Amino acid sequence: MSKIIAIANQKGGVGKTTTCVNLCCALKMKGKKVLILDCDPQGNSTSGMGVDKYSTPGTYELIAKKADIYDCIRKTPYGDVIPSNKELSGATVALVLAEKREYVLKDALQLVYNDYDYIFIDCPPSLELLTLNALVAADSIITVSYTHLRAHETS
């Protein structure tokens, strides 16, 4: 039974991806089964885990229901990854049109829920449907933030 953890903050550059990849790798080193679902179109968790961000299918195909979740998973020595790239930016259109659109990721992750000890969702730096999906799917949320005054301002 998995623990699904979304790593989120609407601000970019605060360390969400670094936290996600480091937690995943540390838990893998402890013998845990881990998966990163990269929901950021920048695909930095994907490349940070050593996966080509243009390998498909990935998060976009999963959300658009063009691929099965098992076909989207890439195995690495550091943990498993569902890759992302700039194509994921188009997922919002697929989500807007989807029935129960805020549950698309939750429903997809149910299929692999018992295969992993931890599933990390690396969220984009925004509050839109991808992030909403991640938050609905998650059991817990880690909000990464700097502690200086300007860190709490958003553009």
Regions found by a protein language model. Give the residues of each.
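P-loop NTP-binding core
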Residues: 1-150, 155
